[in-house]
Amino acid sequence: MTSPLTALSVNLNKIALIRNSRDTKYPSITKHAQMCIDAGADGITVHPRPDQRHIRVDDCFDLAEILQVELNIEGNPFAPPMKSNRKSVSDYPGFIELVKMIKPAQCTLVPDDQHQLTSDHGFDLTQSGDKLLPIIEDLQKLGIRVSLFMEPDIDQIRLAKQINTDRIELYTGPYATAYEEKEIHPEYFEKIFAQFYSSGEIAAELNLGLNAGHDLNLSNLKKFATIPNLLEVSIGHALTVDAIEYGLANAVRAYQKSLGN
């Protein structure tokens, strides 16, 4: 049975990518955020990378000013400042500096670099835990809830608890891939799903909030939403693709229905 408490946060990066492809002011990020909210989205997610190839610094400020729902800003906590070299685009101040200025409801720390097309792995806290601890503490002092992008590895999840993060966001790429092939390799799918399910159980035992995201779509979401302790899913690419076919409002409603909301 799906949980009625699983929030849907819509990632707007693909909307920004369409806008930036023509260097225009439309589609409007704030307008589309409001359309998502009016259709029932519980939150908005953005991932401003240093090169600002989709979401830009100014988008983050604009969204923070108008949103009446939670804003989740994702990014690499070690991303440094970068000049934009474009008159209409503000310089990137560094990820953590941007988050401290915006003060979103949630900040999701992700171990990607500026050359990655998309996020494709979680933190290895045996390597980065000591560096992340003071960052997490600084953000929490500002009233920002912190989530770490993680893989469904129980030992890593226990380490996440030790550095006092509020939540973890499970990287669901492997689940989505296994789901696509579940008719051909059902045993492999069940093995992968069991890893995610166990991760949800461990997170609950540790009193860690559980988020999830990456490649979730209308086909695979309902099954994933049976995982215990799932508080939020962040979905952008697939929802944007579905919006082309069904319309944005209908796409948001369809995802909420898949969550059982």
Model-derived features: positions:
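N-terminal small/glycine-rich loop or linker at the start of catalytic domains
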Residues: 2-22, 111, 117-121, 132-141
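Conserved N-terminal beta1-alpha1 strand-loop-helix module at the mouth
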Residues: 1-79, 83-91, 100-102, 159-162, ...
